[in-house]
Amino acid sequence: QTSILTIQLHGGSTAEEVAALRDNLGPAGKLIYAAHVLGMQVTPALEPYYDLVDAVLLDSMDRETGKVGGTGMTHNWDVSAAAAAASPVPLTLAGGLTPDNVAGAIRHVRPFAVDANSALKGFDGSLDLNLCTAFVRNAKNAN
C-alpha cells in the first residue's frame, strides 16, 4: 500500500484497466485521464472513461513523432471546447499554452483548469518566474 491519492493516466489504458485501478485506489483516490487532440478528434474517445475518472486532461499530440505531452504545440481549440462542454467531469486544457495565448484559450474552451510546461521554462530548462507569473496573471484575467 502507498499513500498515493491522485494518479494521472496518459492513454493506452483500456476502460477495464482504469476500472480495476479505480477499485484498487480506494474511495479517497482520484484518477485523471489524459487524452490527446489529433486533428478534429480526441484520442482515445473520452466517453468510456467518464464514469471511471474524476477529471480529464486534453493535451496535444505531435502527428509526426507521435509524442504526447510536452510538445509545445497547440491543437484545435474547437475540439477541446466541444469536449469541455460535453464532459461531466472537470476538464483541464494543456498543449502549447503560453502567457500570450492562455487567456484566449480559456475564453474559447472554458476548461476547469489549464496546464503548461515547456512555454514556462527558461533557456536553462528550469521554470522561469517571470513567465510563470505572466501565465497565472493572464489566466486569472481571462474572464
Residue ranges of model-derived segments:
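Conserved anion-binding
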Residues: 1-93
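Proline-aspartate-enriched helix->loop->beta-strand connector
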Residues: 4, 111-114
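Glycine-centered flexibility sites
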Residues: 11-12, 69-72, 95-96, 113, ...
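C-terminal helical cap(s) of enzyme catalytic domains, especially alpha/beta-barrels
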Residues: 20-22, 106-107, 117-143
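Short, structured secondary-structure boundary patches
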Residues: 29-31, 114-117
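Secondary-structure boundary/capping motif
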Residues: 41, 67, 101, 124-127
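Residue-level signal for the nucleotide or nucleotide-sugar donor/cofactor binding architecture
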Residues: 75, 97-100, 127-130
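A C-terminal functional module that forms or caps the active site or interfaces directly
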Residues: 91-107, 121
